[in-house]
Amino acid sequence: RDLVRSRGLGDVYKRQGQSYEIKGVRHAIDSGLALIPEDRRREGLVLMHSVEENLIVPIFDKLKRGLLLENKKVADIAERSISDMAIKTHSRKTPAFNLSGGNQQKIVVGKWLNSAPSVLLLDEPTAGVDVGSKREIIDKVRDFVGENRAAIFISSDILELISACDRFIVFYDGKVTATYNRSEITEEVLQYAIQNEC
């Protein structure tokens, strides 16, 4: 995605405080970054492929022995992800296009969690998703952060941000205009900040 390739978005810092340049998608994955894109159907999934195939995309190379996939490992990872993410599907072999929007998004989140990232970037991760799936996805993100990892959550849904985030950074016209901790935030405060009124 352009987010990975762009050079004008600022520096990325590892925990040791050293900045580094993202050189491509594979380098980003190997560096512990994962992106949940806004458009899951165009950028997050290969719709004609199975649930299983989608779930292993980021770790495909790690599941090969020579030129062949280790089918038992693939099946185990897919079944575990389907269970962990509560993906409703008849089979791990079901094409992704047959699933509901909420279950498709769970595949996208699940496949990137399979890559064991240290930083998860989520761009409107619950757009067009049913209420139950929204809650499940947000819970998974909070579990991820609870493992001493980081998530950057981008959303136009203020209530969703409040339920999902511990720290809030508001950008306006390309600049940071406000930052808040969870204890400081309310819907009204965040709404005013977004409108550049505080």
Task: Describe the role of every protein-language-model region.
Residues N114-S118, E124:
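A short, proline-enriched helix->beta-strand linker immediately N-terminal to the Walker B motif
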Residues R167, T179:
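Short, glycine/charged-rich "phosphate-handling" switch motifs in NTP-dependent
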Residues D123, D130:
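ABC-family nucleotide-binding domains
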Residues K134-E147:
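Helical segment within the ABC ATPase nucleotide-binding domain
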Residues R1-Y13:
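Single conserved hydrophobic/aromatic residue that forms the stacking wall/gate
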